[in-house]
């Protein structure tokens, strides 16, 4: 889990727009966040396997 202070800091509006960054809404991870879901790759994988993300399927080719 991310530190609560860093999660709160990310939620605040920054002084300059370029300083804003995305964090996972579920665990607070700052890297590898999917904008479409607002989740990190790990949480997307866990939720997709559990069937909690509608419209997401395991690819096969």
UniProtKB/Swiss-Prot annotation:
GO terms under cellular component: cytoplasm; small ribosomal subunit
SUPFAM superfamilies documented for this protein: Glucocorticoid receptor-like (DNA-binding domain)
PROSITE patterns in UniProt: RIBOSOMAL_S14
Keywords: Metal-binding, Ribonucleoprotein, Ribosomal protein, RNA-binding, rRNA-binding, Zinc
Entry's cofactor comment: Binds 1 zinc ion per subunit.
Annotated InterPro entries: Ribosomal_uS14 (IPR001209), Ribosomal_uS14_bact (IPR023053), Ribosomal_uS14_CS (IPR018271), Ribosomal_uS14_sf (IPR043140)
Residues noted as binding Zn(2+) in the record, renumbered to the chain: 24, 27, 40, 43
Keyword presence, RNA-binding: yes
GO biological process, one term: translation
Keyword hit for Nucleotide-binding: no
MF terms (GO), sorted A to Z: rRNA binding; structural constituent of ribosome; zinc ion binding
Cofactors, names only: Zn(2+)
Subunit structure: Part of the 30S ribosomal subunit. Contacts proteins S3 and S10.
Family as reported in the entry's similarity comment: Belongs to the universal ribosomal protein uS14 family. Zinc-binding uS14 subfamily.
Listed NCBIfam families: PRK08061.1 (NF005974)
Role, per record: Binds 16S rRNA, required for the assembly of 30S particles and may also be responsible for determining the conformation of the 16S rRNA at the A site.
Protein name in UniProt: Small ribosomal subunit protein uS14
Organism: Rhodococcus erythropolis (strain PR4 / NBRC 100887)
